[in-house]
Structure formats: C-alpha cells, structure tokens
C-alpha cells in the first residue's frame, strides 16, 4: 500500500495508510535500525544499515526522518542523487519511507544552519531521536566533529508497508 505526502492518514479507498510514525515505530526496540538505500552513479542500489528517527525539521518544523552519516560513498551518492529509501522492520513487518535527502553538515551548509554549535546540537538531536544514548556527550561531539558527520533529513514523499 502506498500514498503520496498530501494524504498521510487515509488512502483514496478509506483504508488506513502507513505513516511516518508507523514506519519509525517498527524500529523503536532496536535503536532506530533501518536500511538506507541510495543510488550509485551507474544506477544500481547501495544499501547500508543506519540509525534513523523522526524529528521536526530545524527550519520548517515539519516532521522528517533523520539520520547521521559520514564517509565517501553514501554522501557522494546523496549529493549527486538525493533520492533515497529507508526501510524499517520488526519481524516480518516492514515499512519504507521514500524521499529526497537534505544534507546539513560541515561540508553541506544550509542557510538555517549558521554555526558549528547548531550542528553539534542537531547531531545530538538526530542521535537521540533514533533511540541513541551516550554516557559521554563531549566524546560524542568530538567524534562527530572529527569525522565531519552530516545530518540527512528526509521529508517523506511516499510511505508504504506490508501491513
């Protein structure tokens, strides 16, 4: 079952539809573990395991899916081709969120992200939205900055599931 963003609660037939909340809830017991799929330059899929959660967009307040990433492959894919799919599961139940990535980080400036302190706090917010906890936030902040971590925000264009 799938739907467009303009109708997040019911389908055309009146059947209940999968929402962003439904999708994220599947991974609540597993610290937001999900598979993110991006497009390589040759059009094939690159998939990897991430922690993802839901939070208000820092500029608009709209509910978005968020994750943190770093490294060459996934970021290069998202910079060139921002389309992605994030799939959550619990047992045999699954839900996929599709949309376009909005990147925010030290190498991906956004007009609403004006300084390193805002990025530091946003990285923490995304981590905790995905169910993460940390015993030493100073260490967490240091590693995020050292690895030049980037926040990926996804405004869902489609959410669908097998249930």
Q: At which residue positions do the language-model features occur?
A:
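Glycine-rich nucleotide phosphate-binding loop and flanking beta-alpha elements
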Residues: 42, 73, 158-160
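Charged, gly/pro-rich active-site loop segments
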Residues: 3-14, 92-163
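Alpha-helix boundary recognition
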Residues: 25-29, 79-80, 145
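Short, basic/aromatic recognition patches
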Residues: 12-35
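Short beta-strand segments
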Residues: 31-70, 78, 84-88, 96-100
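Short acidic (Asp/Glu) patches
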Residues: 69-72, 79-83, 128-139
């Amino acid at each position: 079952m799938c739907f467009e963003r303009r109708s997040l609660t019911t389908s055309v037939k009146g059947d209940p539809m999968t929402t962003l909340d439904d999708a994220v809830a599947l991974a609540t017991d597993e610290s937001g573990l999900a598979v993110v799929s991006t497009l390589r330059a040759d059009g094939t899929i690159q998939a990897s395991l991430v922690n993802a959660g839901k939070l208000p967009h820092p500029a608009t307040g709209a509910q978005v899916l968020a994750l943190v990433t770093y490294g060459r492959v996934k970021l290069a894919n998202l910079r060139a081709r921002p389309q992605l799919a994030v799939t959550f599961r619990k047992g045999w139940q699954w839900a996929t969120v599709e949309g376009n990535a909005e990147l925010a980080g030290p190498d991906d400036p956004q007009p609403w992200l004006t300084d390193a302190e805002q990025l530091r706090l946003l990285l923490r917010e995304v981590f905790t939205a995905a169910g993460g906890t940390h015993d030493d936030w100073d260490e967490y902040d240091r590693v995020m900055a050292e690895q030049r971590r980037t926040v990926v925000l996804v405004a869902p264009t489609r959410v669908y599931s097998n249930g």
